[in-house]
Structure formats: C-alpha cells, structure tokens
Amino acid sequence: MSGVAGHAEVVGGGIGGLSAAIALGKRGWTVRLHERNDEIRASGSGIYLWDNGLAALDYLGALDSTLVGAHFGARMQTRDAHNALVASSEVNRAGGPRVVTVARERLINALLASADAVGVEVVTGSTVTRVDAAGRIEFDNGHADADLIVVADGIGSRSRDQLGVKTRRRQLNQKCARVLLPREPGMVPSEWVDEYVTFYSGQRFLLYTPCSADLLYLALVCPSDDAPATGDPLPREAWIASFPQLAPLIDRIGPTPRWDEFEMLTLDSWSSGRVAILGDAAHAQPPSLGQGGGCAMLSALGLAHSLSKNYDLTTALGEWESSERSVIQRTQWFSYWLARANKLPDRPRSLLLSAAGHSSLYRNNRMRAALTTPTGITSSK
C-alpha cells in the first residue's frame, strides 16, 4: 500500500473524530477512538447535510442509514418579524444544490455503525489527559504511542492547547438554544410547513427546520446579554413577543438548559509533529451556513487521502492543510460575517439579505463548501 499507514489514536467522538477514524480505517490504519463521556450521543438538535456532507457520508458508508426518514425541503426562506418573505432559494432540484436535514443523533449512530464496520475501536469513558507532538497520548490510567494522533474534541480542546499551536477565538456575543419537538398539525402555516425558514426580529432569530415527518428542530438565537430571552425554562413570553406568528410553536418548547456561545476559531497550523487537529478544535464557525459538520468531514477525508499519497507524515500533513484550509477558512469567514449581520436593525438587514439573494457572487461564496467534493473521492452528483 502506498503512503503512510500505521496506528492512529483519535480524540473525540463527534462528527470530525468519527469521520477521521472511519476514513483512516478504510485506508488500512488501525484506529482507536476515545470519547470522554460514557456513551457517544448527540445533543437534542438537528443538522443540515449539504452536497459535501452527503458525498462524505456516502464514502464513509453512513449515507443510507443517515437518510432513513430524513427531510428534503424545497426552499430555504428568510422571513421578518411580520412573517413577510425577505429571501427564498430553491434546493433539492435536479442539477441544483442538495440539502437534507436529520436529527444529529441519527447521523452519529450511522457513523458509529460505519466505524464498527471498518474495525475502529471505540473507547468511551476515556479521558485523555495529555497529547504531545511526538505521538504519545496519555490517559487517567496509562498511555499509548501512535503513528498519528487526531485531535477532534471540540472548540475548547485541551489536547490542542497542550501542543502550543497559536489559537485565535473570535466571540460573536450571540448564544443559541437548540431543541427538538414532535411535529403536530396546525403548529405553523401550511405555506411553509415543510420549508427551512429563518425568522428575524430585532437581534433575535429563530431557525425552523423539519428533520423528518414527525420531528422538528428549532434554534433560538439572541445576543449573549439578552437576559430576558435566555434561561431554563425558556422565557416563552419574550420569544412570542418577538415572533407572535410562531406562538403555537414556541408554546410547545420544553427545557432549554444549554445556551451555546457562537464563536469562530482559527489556528496558525492544523498540525504539530504527529498530531493533526480538525473539526471545531481547528476551524469552528458559527452555524450561519450549516457547514460545521460538513467542513469537519471535508477535513477528515482530506487528511486520510493525503496520508495515503505520501510516505512521509510531515509532507502528508502539510499537503492536507494546503488542500483543505482555503475552502474551510473562506467558509468560516463568510459564516462569521453573516452572523454579524444579525446585529443590524430590521429594515437594513432585510434589504441586505434581499439584495444578497439576487447576487450570484453571494450565492457562489455561500455555497462554496457545500458544493465542494471531498478530496480523494468522486463527485456523487
């Protein structure tokens, strides 16, 4: 077999870590993946899977399981506080961009099944205490040496920080609660019941996402200092005041114990010695484009491909970053600036988003990562 192959230790059981583990396993590596929690499971949210993610999942052997019961909407819409349509774009038409939405748990379970199929050893309840560039990984109860360590344990990764890689985190001063609800008749108007819709009102916005015939994903976003809008239970009155047309929907929201801050993270380098860093640990972005998971999969598959082409690990890691960083970093910045548009007053924001929807330059940049075929595989379109 050409290229580098050996033993890899993967830190983190999210989308990036699982994708890297499977991709390496498919290319002849032995792989052990560590998840600090007692089980690998997703938080109660949905996820958008665009062309890039669908192609990656097909290669990883997880596509069919992921798509069971998935939702294929026809349009992405933006509406204002009065329910007026600001912008709309078609998806899932022949020759156009594809996007499906599923519960994140379904995706994670599909990836776990694929990891098992290629022989990845998954160790839960495994706390990694130290990673070094020479390829040593330490745990509460011992250590191991690896030809490659993949760090994919999230934006707050301690393993990454131990490597001394220069990190920059940009706060957006926005936070988000994510919930899943059963879909019920009459919750929303029939004209957009099956569409993907973002509603704006002041500096609050609400993302409406069907995930299946019977499951709905909502994301509620507001400024970090908007105390009247945050907390557990959700202050429903505050959100209904902003979105009165969504009152039947908001009234059904249950506990909201977790409010995540939106951030963008960049690194000077995605690797150090025998360690590769990917996913939110390397290139976190606000979810404005629904590309956090997609970019993690692009990075993971690109890493495995570069390793398969080069006998030298240092050369392979350098080639990997050169190949993947441009499109991912452009996507990060586009997502960052799109999130910042939420700070605009309603009228200027509506005018901006309406004009952007008619701009081919805007559409091309918005869709850059979504339409990127993962390195090393054939386009599925």
UniProtKB/Swiss-Prot annotation:
Enzyme category, top tier: oxidoreductase
Induction annotation: Up-regulated by PQS.
One annotated GO molecular function: FAD binding
Keyword vocabulary terms for this entry: Monooxygenase, NAD, Oxidoreductase, Plasmid
Record's catalysed reaction(s): 2-heptyl-4(1H)-quinolone + NADH + O2 + H(+) = 2-heptyl-3-hydroxy-4(1H)-quinolone + NAD(+) + H2O
Its EC number(s): 1.14.13.182
Keyword NAD: yes
Matching InterPro entries: FAD-bd, FAD-dep_Monooxygenase_BioMet, FAD/NAD-bd_sf
Protein's job: Could be involved in the degradation of the Pseudomonas aeruginosa quorum sensing signal molecule HHQ (2-heptyl-4-quinolone) to anthranilic acid. May catalyze the hydroxylation of HHQ to PQS (2-heptyl-3-hydroxy-4-quinolone).
Family in the record: Belongs to the 3-hydroxybenzoate 6-hydroxylase family.
Full protein name: Putative 2-heptyl-3-hydroxy-4(1H)-quinolone synthase AqdB1
